[in-house]
């Protein structure tokens, strides 16, 4: 006999969990659509050569790569952005530019499994392709904020940086291996200052003084300073080199655009330590954390990549986008008790006291569904205790009971499972009125 078990880093999703996830995905999808983003789908499995060029060395170690039955070198996608690059290169002539897309799907990374981090997880990506305008960057941040608010989250912060600022800092210190240094700096929250120092010494052969000065500069944060105060504080950096100048100027323009949108300034701050480990980012980058659950890591991250299609096409298409980590958000929302705890999406359970009443019960259920009330019929004629127990376990809000009197008069008795109140022999319209008084969760 086979012992049923699940691989580490993977998980089954029980009905309650699957319902919660579906509800969250539906909410963020509405936000994406409200900004004009359209859905696309790409395969879970790609040619390995499609995925590998833009993966950092750390990500390459985590990629699930193997030979398929045709002896082709293939891999499971580790994000949705690299497949987007392949997709846009293949279809750009019929898509029209600029192109705004969102994609929701599972991705795979063989990283160490821990709280809120899985080896298979769902990403919700939204991207603006084919424009260099910082208006696009501002809109992506606007969508991040609108999406989290749609999930009833208010206490969070989008930490913003620019890869040119990081490139400029490396240039200022004469560091040649920029991508490797930034890959390590990106681990600051994960392995701490001492861990980053050790890796920079070991892997980049930097001396202690350079590391000290480098880390001091990349830890510059806006914190409680106003936008104007912060930009005044870092203005001197624009004289160091063109990369720093361009990066800071772009952030100043971005902040002007975000200010015009009247977004609360508490929701976004500049943080020079935000690097994003993926090598394809070239411009503004950002990570979003929940202020009371920072140990969970980023729940939404992204940035600008101005060489999106360089590996697939001579025609270069730039883009900017972000990805919402829905699985991490589920962990957070669960701890905040902001999730629906029911194991059913049906609001009403219909219970019959005798086999011959099922024809009426099924007609009643269909009438409720046509009125927008999700309903199910308990499939066995039982003593009423068993259907009530079932409804309590699943989370039905109402139980409609069909006994002899209800069957003969074509009425129903209705019990509110939350309050315990029961009303007998109601007409369909009266029952519908009562059930519909609290239908916002349908």
From Swiss-Prot:
Major localization listed first in the record, in broad terms:
cytoplasm
Q: Keywords on this record?
A: Aminoacyl-tRNA synthetase, ATP-binding, Cytoplasm, Ligase, Nucleotide-binding, Protein biosynthesis
Under Enzyme Commission nomenclature, its number is: 6.1.1.21
InterPro entries given in the database record:
aa-tRNA-synth_II, aa-tRNA-synth_II/BPL/LPL, Anticodon-bd, Anticodon-bd_dom_sf, His-tRNA-ligase, HisRS-like_core, HisRS/HisZ, HisRS_anticodon
GO cellular component terms, alphabetically, are: cytoplasm
Q: List localization entries.
A: Cytoplasm
Task: Report the PROSITE patterns cross-referenced here.
Answer: AA_TRNA_LIGASE_II
- Which Pfam families does the UniProt record give? HGTP_anticodon (PF03129), tRNA-synt_His (PF13393)
Q: Which GO BP terms apply? A: histidyl-tRNA aminoacylation
The keyword Nucleotide-binding is annotated on this UniProt entry? yes
Family (UniProt): Belongs to the class-II aminoacyl-tRNA synthetase family.
Q: What is this protein called?
A: Histidine--tRNA ligase
Its gene?
Answer: hisS
